[in-house]
Amino acid sequence: MKMRSIFVIAILAATTAAVLFHGSVVDVQQSHHTERISGTGGDVLEEDPVGKLKVYVYDLPAKYNTKPVEKDPRCLTHMFATEIFVHRSLLSSAVRTLDPEEADWFYAPVYTTCDLTASGHPMPFDSPRMMRSAIRLIAERWPYWNRSEGVDHFFVTPHDFGACFHFQEEKAMARGILPVLRRATLVQTFGQRNHVCLKDGSITIPPYAPPWKMEAQLLPPATPRSIFVYFRGLFYDAGNDPEGGYYARGA
Ligand SMILES: *[C@@H]1O[C@H](CO)[C@@H](O)[C@H](O)[C@H]1NC(C)=O
């Protein structure tokens, strides 16, 4: 539940430009008795978006979202499960509107990372086709996409290099962001600045971690800690890239 609300806050915060997650730096400074955080750890959203922001959630055919999860429930606990939980939380969110005419923002639930191999690795090779197909449908059935080619639309694209949809950096960069998504807002875990797979205005979010795993790590607040916060950084894929090239980067 907690993780879900964090993601919703991240999404809502973007519309008010109140939160800039990507590139945030947290410096942990040690002193004799206490640890202090300085730097820009991300601004806090102070305004309550309820009543000010309305999000319309497209009702897409199940093949774009719930069907793949039924087929492979491992998608629910995978690090890319954000695409599922953002969708679920928006469905019952106070910012949701059922009337697209009054919407400020449109969300299309397309789960592009739920095609897992036997060993649980997501295969993004079908993602571009799936995304293009969903957008074609949205553009045909509703008038809102064509007004601005999706400027007021957002998508969750949590795969390694976001909407570049490839797990190897060179190939992801050569592909670039899927053209049909270039005007929309992308919510993604990939957050490296000045990278072709991160466009301006994207929202960087943490990968999904199942609540029971998070809860298992909870420490009593008074516990002395030498590490205050830890961000997972580079990923290496020794199997596919024995030379040690980058596989993907954490947010
Ligand atoms: C939006 O544009 C596409 C491509 O030109 C077209 O096929 C579609 O019918 C348009 N949608 C609407 C609702 O007019």
What are these regions (language model features)?
Residues 2-251:
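Nucleotide-sugar donor-binding catalytic core of glycosyltransferases
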